[in-house]
C-alpha cells in the first residue's frame, strides 16, 4: 500500500507539470515508452534497480538511455529524480497512476463491459451513450465476452461494479432458496 501512495504522489506531480506545460498526453506517452523499454530490457532494468551498482554508474546508463529516446526535458528530469531517490522500481505503478490522473484531468472514464455473448455495434454504442449520460464524462469503453455469465452484462467503472448478469441473479435466487 505504501508503494501505491508513493507512486500516486510522483504521478500526480508529473501530471501537474504536464498540465502546466500543456503536455499531459505527451508526458504519458514518454513515461510509457520508458517503462516499456525497462520491461523489454531486463539488463537495463536490473542495473537501474539494483543496489549493487553505484549511483554514478546508474546515472550514466540512464543518461545514455534518455539521449537515445529523445524524451522531453521534464520527463528526463523526472526519471533522474526517481533514480536519485531510489524510486525507479515504482515506475510501472507510477505510469499506471499517471494514466488514471490524466484521464481524471481530461474527464475520461474507461469502463469495462463484460457480456455473455458478443454485442452488436449498436448495443455497444447504446451502452456507451448511457454511460456518457450517467457520468457526464467521455467514455472509452472496453468490451469483453465471458460466456459463464449466461446472459446480461457486468459493467465495471474504476472500482465500482454493476452486475446485471444472469449468473449473479441465479446465484441470488439459489441463496434465497437455501436460506428458506
UniProtKB/Swiss-Prot annotation:
It is found in: Cell inner membrane. Signal peptide: none annotated. It holds the Pfam family OSCP. It is a peripheral membrane protein. One of its GO terms (molecular function) is proton-transporting ATP synthase activity, rotational mechanism. GO terms for cellular component: plasma membrane; proton-transporting ATP synthase complex. F(1)F(0) ATP synthase produces ATP from ADP in the presence of a proton or sodium gradient. F-type ATPases consist of two structural domains, F(1) containing the extramembraneous catalytic core and F(0) containing the membrane proton channel, linked together by a central stalk and a peripheral stalk. During catalysis, ATP synthesis in the catalytic domain of F(1) is coupled via a rotary mechanism of the central stalk subunits to proton translocation. F-type ATPases have 2 components, F(1) - the catalytic core - and F(0) - the membrane proton channel. F(1) has five subunits: alpha(3), beta(3), gamma(1), delta(1), epsilon(1). F(0) has three main subunits: a(1), b(2) and c(10-14). The alpha and beta chains form an alternating ring which encloses part of the gamma chain. F(1) is attached to F(0) by a central stalk formed by the gamma and epsilon chains, while a peripheral stalk is formed by the delta and b chains. This is ATP synthase subunit delta. It comes from Geobacter metallireducens (strain ATCC 53774 / DSM 7210 / GS-15).
